[in-house]
Design a protein with these regions (language model features):
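HotDog/MaoC-like acyl-thioester-processing domains
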Residues: 1-10, 14, 83-172, 246-249, ...
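Intrinsically disordered, low-complexity coil segments
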Residues: 39, 129-133, 229-231
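Short, mixed-charge, low-aromatic patches
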Residues: 1, 58-61, 78, 138-140, ...
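Catalytic-pocket segment enriched in acidic/His residues
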Residues: 198-276, 281
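Generic structural "secondary-structure junction" signal
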Residues: 46-48, 83-84, 90, 96, ...
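Hydrophobic, proline/glycine-rich low-complexity stretches
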Residues: 1-99
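A contiguous, surface-exposed recognition patch within enzymatic or periplasmic domains that forms
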Residues: 2-47, 155-215, 222-225
Length: 286
C-alpha cells in the first residue's frame, strides 16, 4: 500500500506526558559515556546527585511518541526505514528531574521518486508541564527506503553544510563501553538489534550495534567538553547526519572546526577509521 500523503501529514499524535527523576538523568549520562573518568569533577555533575545537571542531549529521549510507523494504517514499509538525521534546538536547560509534555507533528514528507524512497521529517516540542516553557525542539529525519513514488510531497529540505577540508581546529576522543548499548536501551530504544546477537546477525551485523542516538550523545559530549566547558547552558543546538554504525566499545573521535560562530564537525571510529557521523553543526551560545 503506497503512502497516503495527507494521512501522514495529519497523523493524530497524542501529547506524551513523561515524568523523570534524577536517576533517569544519571542513567542517560552514563549511557552516552559521561563519567568514564570518575575523578573528573566536570563530568561528575552529570552522573552524581550532588549539584546534578542534565545532559542537554537527553532531550532526544523525552516525550517520545513511540514507534508509530509500524502501524499498518501508515502505509510505511517500516522494515526498510533508516534514521538519517537528527537535529536539536535547546531553548532552556533541561531540568535534572521533572515532568514534560512531548508534542509531535509531521513537518515534511518528501517524495524522492519511485524506487528512490521518501524523507519523513518529524518535529517534536518538549514543554515543561509545570511552567509551560518550551525546553527543546527536535527534528527526526527518517529515510523511508521502500516508500517513494506516491506522487505528492513537500519540497526537499536544504542539504546540511559540508565539513571543511584541512586540519580540524580541535579533536576529542571519547571511548564507548562494550556494554554501552545495553545501558542506553534502558533510557529509550529497546530494539533488540542493540542487544540480541542473533537479531544483529540477521540484520547483517557481526554483533549488536550502538544506537544512533547514543552516538549522537557522544558527539554532544565532545562539543560540550571542548567548546562549552561542560556548561549545558552554552549548547544551543546540535544537528548531524548518521553515516555508519558504531559498535559498542569503539572509540569515537570528533573532529571540529569553528566557522561563523558555529562548530562544524564529524565523528569517526578510530579502530576502523570510518566516519560514522557527518555534516554536524553545533550552535554555541555566548
Amino acid at each position: 500500500m503506497p503512502i497516503d500523503y495527507d494521512k501522514i501529514k495529519n497523523w493524530p499524535f497524542p501529547d506524551v506526558e513523561q515524568s523523570y527523576s534524577e536517576k533517569d538523568s544519571i542513567l542517560y549520562a552514563l549511557g552516552v559515556g559521561y563519567g568514564h573518568d570518575p575523578m573528573d569533577e566536570a563530568q561528575l555533575r552529570f552522573v552524581y546527585e550532588k549539584n546534578l545537571q542534565a545532559v542537554p542531549t537527553m532531550a532526544v529521549v523525552l516525550g517520545y511518541p513511540g514507534f508509530w510507523v509500524k502501524d499498518p494504517a501508515s502505509g510505511i514499509d517500516w522494515v526498510k526505514i533508516v534514521h538519517g538525521e537528527q537535529a536539536l534546538r535547546i531553548h532552556r536547560p533541561i531540568p535534572a528531574s521533572g515532568t514534560v509534555i512531548g508534542r509531535t507533528r509531521i513537518k515534511a514528507l518528501v517524495d524522492k521518486g519511485k524506487d528512490k524512497g521518501a524523507l519523513l521529517i518529524q518535529e517534536r516540542s518538549i514543554v515543561d508541564k509545570k511552567s509551560g516553557a518550551l525546553l527543546a525542539t527536535l527534528e527526526h529525519t527518517t529515510f523511508c527506503r521502500g516508500d517513494g513514488g506516491f506522487g505528492k510531497g513537500d519540497p526537499a529540505p536544504p542539504s546540511p553544510p559540508a565539513v571543511p577540508d584541512g586540519t580540524p581546529d580541535a579533536t576529542c576522543d571519547l571511548p564507548t563501553l562494550p556494554q554501552a548499548a545495553l545501558i542506553y536501551r534502558l533510557c529509550a530504544d529497546n530494539n533488540p538489534l542493540h542487544a540480541d546477537p542473533a537479531v544483529a546477525k540477521a540484520a547483517g551485523f557481526a554483533r549488536p550495534i550502538l544506537h544512533g542516538l547514543c552516538s549522537y550523545g557522544v558527539a554532544g559530549h565532545a562539543i560540550l567538553k571542548t567548546w562549552c566547558g561542560y556548561d549545558p547552558a552554552k549548547l544551543g543546538g546540535l544537528s548531524l547526519r548518521f553515516s555508519a554504525p558504531v559498535f559498542p566499545g569503539e572509540t569515537i573521535r570528533t573532529e571540529m572546526w569553528r566557522r561563523d560562530g558555529n562548530i562544524l564537525f564529524r565523528s569517526r571510529v578510530l579502530e576502523r577509521n570510518v566516519v560514522v557521523l557527518n555534516n554536524g553543526v553545533a550552535t554555541i551560545n555566548p
